[in-house]
From Swiss-Prot:
Name of the encoding gene: ku70
Protein name: ATP-dependent DNA helicase 2 subunit 1
Organism expressing this protein natively: Rhipicephalus appendiculatus
Catalytic activity: ATP + H2O = ADP + phosphate + H(+)
Compartment list: Nucleus; Chromosome
EC number: 3.6.4.12
């Protein structure tokens, strides 16, 4: 059974959806929360322990909405009572390592509502043995299916063992065992009570996994809830790499890099089909059948065809992949261009972020850093030939260098690396029609008034300040339904203009602009309605304009130039009608039909 060999949607799928299956990559994070008496000293009506519980709850809610299959667990250390598989003293497993749900969130809310006194009655306070705590972490991860495993310690006590060097040494040995097992350990330290300073060099500096991040010293301890939530979110939300690729700088110079997605639009989760009787998730299967015999076909039984000279050429799946594979996946350096030239290039699609991958090719970090510093110093960008995966169409990209930035506390805010920005090909550019003559132009005085008004209303935009109101309302309703609450929270819509603030900042400028733009006898409302009326006098006018634009296109000339694919379907169909040709349903078939008619 043959199929026409045409460009399918899956052949042009996005790199992020075709390279890595995010559904199979499950992250696991364990919160180790200090429950000793020092965490319960009240400051401004709150305690460090309750702040940590609120941070863990916030992480659970974020996981439910963004990564529902990820695993989250909570271990309290320094309690009087114990609850763990090995019966270690002073270690209490509050939440097993599992996907967070309504029950786990409600449990934390109850713990917060009960307060410190109820906690002391139920759990109590005791001593700390970090080796036992880390052993419990390793045991919990060994029974889970987590791929990327992390342990996050939250404490304001820099000396949990009270000067016991023997216990410190045992904890360091156990931390190394975690590292060998692929478990990362990190620290979020809070400000100790009083005027004390947190001293990580006593113990925790030797426990954390990524010591390179703390070569310039640990950031200052957080003392505010907002800062604690930010740090926990940054530690938890480690970017999962999209792919690892070789980067060829020359015939014999190669390094390895990893690609990440820094920013992508968030959408609603995909619909999951459930069985009617037991609510179990249904698995979908697709089977291809032969039209003549209704026999189920295997992938090797299916071939694709392409017509050449009136005859069909048959290709199996492997041959099609070989034809499409122009080169192995990777980045190939072609040259350099100044940033002043590249800043004028149009936007094609969202960019990726490149970071060195030392684990695949040794020395990649040094070579990558040298290239990054040279590009920043000379203000140039490498131009590269990029193939993201096998049988993927090649792309031309340039690498935009980004310098590292840290906040006043030493916390990294912007990572060093390159943004991979795609360059357009010639056929990606649209041919825009020239503006019609006779259009009304604003006077210089009106432009000056508009500029003054815009200057007064200018502010620094950051995407973190504007949440999608539709998504926030959707998740708020789901949260209320899952937690059995009567009313859902109504999130504030920050995308709507704040008219009071706008009037306070630029009220005079706005009034002056309206008076100049709409003099006596003409208001903004009537002008807008008249404009809408003229635009809505019927789709007939718009249709007539599009037909006139299509009639101005010389299809024969475009066919000789090989630009038929850039024309719209309506223009191609009009040409087929004029020539008396049978008009197929698909654009590619229409193009082939016109080529045959013109003998091209």
């Amino acid at each position: 059974m043959d199929q026409p060999w045409m460009r399918q949607d899956d052949d042009e799928s996005d790199d992020e959806s075709s390279t890595v299956d995010f559904g199979q990559a499950v992250d696991g994070i364990l919160f180790l929360i200090d429950a000793t008496e020092g965490m319960f000293e009240e400051v401004d009506g709150d305690t460090a322990f309750m702040q940590c519980i609120k941070a863990a709850k916030s992480t659970m809610l974020n996981k439910i909405t963004s990564s529902p299959k990820d695993l989250v667990g909570i271990i309290l250390f320094g309690t009087d009572k114990d609850n763990n598989p090995n019966r270690f003293k002073n270690v209490y497993v509050l939440q097993d390592l599992e996907s967070p749900g309504a029950e786990s969130v409600l449990k934390l809310e109850k713990l917060i509502a009960d307060g410190p006194k109820k906690f002391k009655q139920e759990y109590g306070h005791g001593n700390v043995n970090m080796a036992d705590v880390l052993w419990t972490c390793a045991l919990m991860f060994s029974k889970s299916r987590a791929g990327q495993r992390r342990v996050l310690v939250l404490t304001n006590q820099d000396d949990p063992h009270k000067g016991s060097g023997d216990l410190d040494d045992k904890a360091v040995v156990k931390a190394k065992d975690l590292l060998q097992s692929g478990i990362e350990l990190d620290l979020v330290h809070l400000k100790p009570p009083g005027d004390k300073k947190f001293r990580p060099q006593i113990l925790y500096k030797n426990l954390v996994t990524d010591k390179e991040n703390y070569e310039d010293g640990f950031p200052e301890a957080s003392d505010k809830m907002e800062e604690l939530l930010l740090r926990v979110r940054m530690k938890d939300h480690k970017k999962r790499r999209l792919m690892s690729l070789p980067f060829w700088l020359g015939p014999e110079v190669k390094m390895s890099v990893s690609l990440y997605n820094l920013v992508r639009p968030t959408g609603k989760p995909a619909t999951t089909r459930l069985a009617r009787d037991n609510n179990e998730e249904l698995l979908s299967r697709r089977i291809t059948y032969a039209m003549d015999s209704a026999e189920a076909l295997m992938p090797g039984d299916i071939s694709k065809t392409q017509e050449y000279g009136g005859r069909k050429a048959y290709f199996d799946i492997c041959e099609v992949k070989q034809i499409k594979s122009m080169a192995p996946p990777g980045l190939q350096l072609l040259g350099f261009k100044p940033l002043s030239y590249l800043e004028k290039q149009p936007h094609v699609r969202p960019s990726h972020f490149v970071y060195p991958d030392e684990g695949s090719v040794r020395g990649s970090t040094r070579l990558f850093a040298a290239l990054l510093q040279s590009c920043l110093r000379h203000r140039v960008a490498p131009i590269c030939f990029w193939i993201s995966r096998a049988a993927q169409a090649p792309k031309l990209v340039y690498l935009l260098a980004q310098e590292e930035e840290r906040d006043p506390h030493g916390l990294q805010m912007v990572p060093p690396g390159f943004h991979v920005v795609q360059l357009p090909f010639s056929d990606d550019r649209r041919r825009l029609q020239a503006l019609q003559e006779g259009t009304t132009k604003a006077t210089p005085g009106l432009v000056a008034l508009a500029r003054e008004m815009a200057e007064k209303l200018r502010f620094t935009y950051h995407p973190d300040k504007f949440e999608n109101p539709e998504l926030q309302g959707f998740w708020s309703c789901l949260e209320a339904l899952a937690l059995d609450r009567d009313d859902a929270e109504h999130p504030k819509d920050y995308t709507r203009p704040d008219h009071e603030k706008m009037k306070a900042k630029a009220g005079e400028e706005m009034d002056a602009f309206l008076e100049a733009a709409f003099p006596d006898g003409c208001s903004a409302t009537t002008a807008g309605s008249r404009k809408r009326t003229q635009a809505g006098e019927g789709g007939q006018a718009k249709k007539a304009r599009s037909e006139n634009q299509g009639s101005n296109v010389d299809v024969r000339e475009e066919a000789k130039r090989g630009k038929l694919a850039s024309l719209t379907v309506s223009v191609l169909r009009d040409f087929c009608k004029q020539e008396g040709l049978r008009c197929p349903s698909k654009k590619a078939e229409i193009v082939d039909c016109i080529k045959k008619h013109l003998k091209l």
